[in-house]
C-alpha cells in the first residue's frame, strides 16, 4: 500500500542519486519519536523513507521539512497491523531504493492501558501484531537489501523492565523486542549488520500525553533523576547515533534513555 505522497514524489526521487549517502527507513515516522528520528537521520545526509499508517498529512509535512532543508525523503504507507503490512512496506521500500538499505528503525508501535482482568483478546493480538510481528517480518523482508555496515534499531520501552501501571500486554511486546535485539544481533553479526534497541522512558508524545499536565509531570519527576520531560529529539539523537558509523562496535545492546528513571 502506498500513500499519495509516495506516488507523487517517487519519480522525482528516482531522478536523484545518493551514492555517498546512507538510505534509511523509519516506521511510524509521521510524528513523535519517529518524526524526530527521520529528521535526525536526514541531518546526517541519509535519504529517508518516512513510513506512516493513516497520518498522510503529517508524513507529508515531515518529508517537506526534510526536502526544504536540502535533504531527500519520500513517504510510504502501510498498515502494520495487517498480516501483509510488513511485506507491502518492504515491497514499496525496494521500489524506492537503489537496491540498498543502510538503516532500519522499527519505531512504529501502539500502546494500551488495560488490566489483566479487562484485556480483550483482539486488542492483545493487535498489540503483538504491530509491536512484534511487524518489526520481525519487516526485518526479514528487507535483509536482502542490507549488507555489511547496515544498522537496525528496534524500539523497546522502560516498561519492559519496570512494571508501571496497567500495561502488562504492551510491556510484554517490548520484552519480546529486547529478545529480538539479542537474537538478531547474534544471527546477523556475521553479515556485518548491527542490531540494537532503544528503551525510552516517558516521552512527551501523543502516547504519553498525560505528562503535559502539572500532575503528570509531578508523577514523572518523582521517579526520574533529571527533572524535565523528555522530548522526542532526546530519543531520536540516540537512535541516530546507534545507526551511525560512530556506533560501529555496538551491537546487541538495549540503551535505556529515560533521564535516570528509578535509579
Predicted region positions:
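Substrate-binding pocket helix/loop in short-chain dehydrogenase/reductase
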Residues: 115-116, 120-128, 220
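C-terminal helical subdomain
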Residues: 197, 219-250, 259
